């Protein structure tokens, strides 16, 4: 007698994470919540502190005239100041506002339906105001040095074209926003939730690396709040000549990163899972 062999179908392991539902495009109900205004305050203060520390570092470095190699922090130190502050501030504010601290990041998350239009617009306003106030404090503390050393404003460096500067801003912001999406992915969060620094750390390190690459080209914008804060307070023609680059570049970079992560990486993973389930040989 032949014995029938019946194989039980393999069970696909359930997901150990949950994708959050898309944020509504217009959520007027947010305007009635204290948590919404608390998040705006957090974004304002975080961007203020970010611009105060980083622009003060830039001005302090430029003031140094000593021949001693240890007389100033140098490009490496400036990059650490920007990356380190993002690490600290994202860590401090992630649970309150999401720790955007950058209109380009907010724009990318809006495109991915992580935040509503109302929240995105209000975040960007709060970030820009925070940037202006932060740079204003720097000018108030070190006015002579501030005016004499370019005010920490983003400008296209001599020897570089507008197109090169725009490309640097697009690629730099792509790196940052792509890192934000990857570090805050629900799947990653579910498995790394016991290590709370794992999201802020790569985001801060991405900012550090981008600054190393692009400080010689544009002074590194990748954050329109940083750029407009310095431009408004410095308020010289050369700070405004190519200012559009520091809005267009970051927003294009954020758009590209959002599309890449949401519609290529995440969509590819969903498609692969569907193919696996529908294949009878698996």
Curated annotation (Swiss-Prot):
Family: Belongs to the MIP/aquaporin (TC 1.A.8) family. PIP (TC 1.A.8.11) subfamily.
Highest taxon of the lineage: Eukaryota
Transferase recorded as keyword: no
InterPro entries: Aquaporin-like (IPR023271), Aquaporin_transptr (IPR034294), MIP (IPR000425), MIP_CS (IPR022357)
UniProt free text on domains: Aquaporins contain two tandem repeats each containing three membrane-spanning domains and a pore-forming loop with the signature motif Asn-Pro-Ala (NPA).
GN (gene name): PIP2-6
Gene Ontology molecular functions: water channel activity
Residue positions of motif NPA 2: 223-225
GO cellular-component term (any): plasma membrane
Membrane topology: Multi-pass membrane protein
Record carries keyword Lyase: no
Organism: Oryza sativa subsp. japonica (Rice)
Annotated function: Aquaporins facilitate the transport of water and small neutral solutes across cell membranes.
PANTHER family: AQUAPORIN OR AQUAGLYCEROPORIN RELATED
Keywords tagged on the record: Cell membrane, Membrane, Repeat, Transmembrane, Transmembrane helix, Transport
Cell compartment(s), UniProt: Cell membrane
Induction: Down-regulated by chilling.
Motif (NPA 1): 102-104
Any single Pfam family the record assigns to this protein: MIP
SUPFAM superfamilies: Aquaporin-like
Name assigned to this protein: Probable aquaporin PIP2-6
Gene3D superfamilies for this protein: Glycerol uptake facilitator protein
Tissue expression remark: Expressed in roots and leaves.
Lineage: Eukaryota, Viridiplantae, Streptophyta, Embryophyta, Tracheophyta
TM regions (residue ranges): 39-59, 76-96, 121-141, 163-183, 197-217, 245-265
